[in-house]
Amino acid sequence: MQTPTFYDIFKQLNNTPRPSHHEERVADFLCNFAQQYGLRYRRDAQNCVVIEKDATPGHENAEPVVILNHMDMVCVAKDGYLRDGHAFDPLSDEIRAYIETVKNPDGSESRWMKAEGTSLGADNGMGLSMALAILADDSLVHGPLEVLTTTNEEDGMSGAEALSTDFIKGRKVINLDSEAYDEITMGAAGAYLQIAHFKADWANVPDGYVFRRIVIDGGLGGHSGVDINKGRCHTNQEICRFIQNFGTDKMMVCAINGGTANASISSVAEVIVAVRPETEKALTEAVVAYNDQLRRQFATTDAGISMRGEETNACSQYLRNAGDIVCAFNELPIGMLKMRDDMPGTVMTSNNAGRIITTDSEVTISCHSRSFSNEEMRALGQGITATFKKYGAVNVELLMDTPAWVERADSPLVALTCQTFQDVLGFEPKKVAMHFVLEAAYYVQKYPGVEIASIGPLIIEPHSTSERVNLDTADNIWKVTLELLKRLA
């Protein structure tokens, strides 16, 4: 049987639908792969799979090494994209990859893999394919191996969170899920996600009022970990500031909504208000003035930001407690709150209020806090809870309390990985810690003494239909990984 390349395996993976929360088929694929090559494997209730491979003869006494990846992907398609005449179905349709050669500014060429009409799944399919290719190749030199593949990494990390403390034996973990080719990730912030619930205290809007929809949009938004220190407009924050500045004594708030995801910086927000006819002019002037202020304030970060008011359908009721809800929001610490002293350019602690939603029964506000200090993160979260309750929240729901992966400055594995990059590729990668949650946090918590180094090929715009992976960097990460395994043996 011919040994498959990791590109061969990646193609097989992309023939197996694997969106988050639907990993049964790809878990079957992994178990069948293990059986095909006569390897031991285990599968838990979350469909996480670990495949074991014995050491190369003569290296049996080496410390076991874990190669870590996740099997799920963010599967999105372009608007209106059809697959063989029907709308793309992530639960049944394969990913169709192709390779494009691009001319670089210096005249050289780069090879990129993309997908036809959908996200590619190089995050984390490329790393997983490399791990499986290592399992399939008996010519390689390595110690005892455990290839661990988790589920639902992209939408909650429930697979990693539920792992039993005896699921793996190794304490040296090579993670192939990084997306910056010239970096080694050696730490990550923890996360604390809360949802505040305010009861919607409705009252009837008196006759004779006029209704306006006030919208802030055109914000750049972004990832609330990666982009939180870039000074971008948080539209939820600005709409609440506007409401408080104008005054709920002069207008009735019928609904307030903003943001699309808890972990994203809000790029659009709106409020529906009712005002007396004699107040309409003042409201219009206030919107124009606030729009001018936003455009000046965010001219360099959010060039498309704008605020406008427009007529809208009448509402029968307004929120009597809107003033309290807005005050609660405006007391929240939002954005980058502290930078790390020991790692220039890295955010230490932040908070993002990514969504505010009005329903028939309640108004909810989400707060996604992050920090490299678990104590600081939880203290921040507790302060936010107190603020919400001070203004009448009936419940503050804690949805995530994930510990930080605090890097080990003296990690022998990280040092060896850096040296291997230098020897194989001629450069030493930058050592970084990420201001967002990574699965590694759970391994640090569950497996005392674990060391983790995360590397990977260059992946641009993951989780989108523009996702692409640089194949030249993938080839080089493959070389580094093989040499690293040899040195660990």
Located regions from the model:
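Active-site-adjacent substrate-binding region
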Residues: D227, H234-Q237, R241-I256, V406-V450
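Midchain, well-structured core segments that form catalytic/ion-binding scaffolds
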Residues: P17, R96, K103, S108-T118, ...
